[in-house]
Amino acid sequence: MPDSGTLGTPPPEQGPTPPTTLPDVPAPVIPSASVTSAASDFLAALHPPVTVPDPAPPPPPAPAAGNPPDTVTGDSVLQRILRGPTGPGTTSLAPAVRYGRQPGPEAPASAPPAAGRAVPGLYHHPVPEPDPVRVEEVSRRIKRWAEDEVQLYPEEWEGQFDGFSVGRYMVGCHPDAPTVDHLMLATRLMVAENAVDDCYCEDHGGSPVGLGGRLLLAHTAIDHFHSTAEYTPTWQASLAADAPRRAYDSAMGYFVRAATPSQSDRYRHDMARLHLGYLAEGAWAQTGHVPEVWEYLAMRQFNNFRPCPTITDTVGGYELPADLHARPDMQRVIALAGNATTIVNDLYSYTKELNSPGRHLNLPVVIAEREQLCERDAYLKAVEVHNELQHSFEAAAADLAEACPLPPVLRFLRGVAAWVDGNHDWHRTNTYRYSLPDFW
């Protein structure tokens, strides 16, 4: 693995940078009412109709038009409450209209849909184009942070950093973030998580050999080491030892200053889950073991996107109380969301991983080997697995919304669903990183 410690010295501790070029507007408060409708109405309200043209086949002639109006069919009481609570003490719980247009001057022309083709047969929900003004601002700030504050990458990796399109990614996944500063909380953490994955596990010198020690020491940047006066300074100095640890340390510092203690602790535990999944995958790579399909899926429940959607309340400027987060039915919703959206990554990165050195485990590869299927049939079965997980996530979210229709629960469920949808859209549109196999 390359020695990233030569990329620069650690920056001084800095507080959150206030927005300078983009005025942030609080999320609007929209009227709501009590819950009386069925769970199916929850699903309808989660996913307003959005048309995203498929660029693959030549489209039939159609009149030029802007994006269709964002509407929600039906007039159920639950649909209205999903738009946000009102009354004393509920301002922070009021989400922005999930896919509604934000007030402000209209652009001279609508931005065309981003290139990219969805996996045929994949159950998903189209989303509108992320706000281009926010995308540009988040992209500018995160690059400044990566280069100036944490010296994240050498010059030759700049193209890969830009191709990651993390600004578009995070704006699309957090449509209810009240300000760009809130979006930056998620963006820094996402970049730091990917730096650890790339530099410790995969693309940029990663190796399963010694992975446990590297991950444990990096984790202390998130979950601090508490020791004696003699040894603490050495640990503090170690946080600047390489780019992944510098990124974790800085990103977590910003997050802790914005989050509540319980939100910060939630994130620490979710990152421990992620690192445990990295270790399982690394152990299999080291021994050449191909797990059973269920074993692979169990590993992916830990090595997955879970830490990203579960900070939706912090990024949204509110808190899902710890007791509500700990409910078994909420934990099931979160697990299913993470599992479904991680299989999306397996499907879109399939071709990229086949063309990379070494053998990469993903769901189609494991199904092909363990169930003796050809590559195409294994890939199509993986699509079916994703679809069942996605439907299960939505059904579990609907059941929870009906069982516990508290405003923070409903908003959190909306946020997780928005993250799942935005994550798929980023994979679909990121043609720099992903392309589909020729199975259709």
UniProtKB/Swiss-Prot annotation:
Signal peptide: none
Positions of region (Disordered): 1-33, 46-74
List of residues binding Mg(2+): 197-198, 202, 345, 349, 353
GO annotation terms (biological process): terpene metabolic process
Pfam families hit by this protein: Terpene_syn_C_2
Database matches in InterPro entries: Isoprenoid_synthase_dom_sf, MIB_synthase, Terpene_cyclase-like_2
Biased composition (Pro residues): 9-29, 50-63
Catalytic activity, as annotated: (E)-2-methylgeranyl diphosphate + H2O = 2-methylisoborneol + diphosphate
Cofactor(s), names only, from the UniProt record: Mg(2+)
Molecular function (Gene Ontology), one example: terpene synthase activity
EC number per UniProt: 4.2.3.118
Key words of the record: Lyase, Magnesium, Metal-binding
Keyword Phosphoprotein appears in the UniProt entry: no
The family this protein is said to belong to: Belongs to the terpene synthase family. 2-methylisoborneol synthase subfamily.
Any further remark recorded for this protein: 2-MIB is a volatile organic compound that has an unusually low odor threshold. Together with geosmin, methylisoborneol is responsible for the characteristic smell of moist soil as well as unpleasant taste and odor episodes associated with public water supplies and contamination of various foodstuffs, including fish, wine, and beer.
Function statement: Catalyzes the cyclization of 2-methylgeranyl diphosphate (2-MeGPP) to 2-methylisoborneol (2-MIB), which likely involves the intermediacy of 2-methyllinalyl diphosphate. Is also able to catalyze the cyclization of geranyl diphosphate (GPP), albeit with much lower efficiency, leading to the formation of a complex mixture of cyclic monoterpenes, consisting of alpha-pinene (6%), beta-pinene (23%), limonene (32%), gamma-terpinene (29%), and delta-terpinene (10%).
Protein name: 2-methylisoborneol synthase
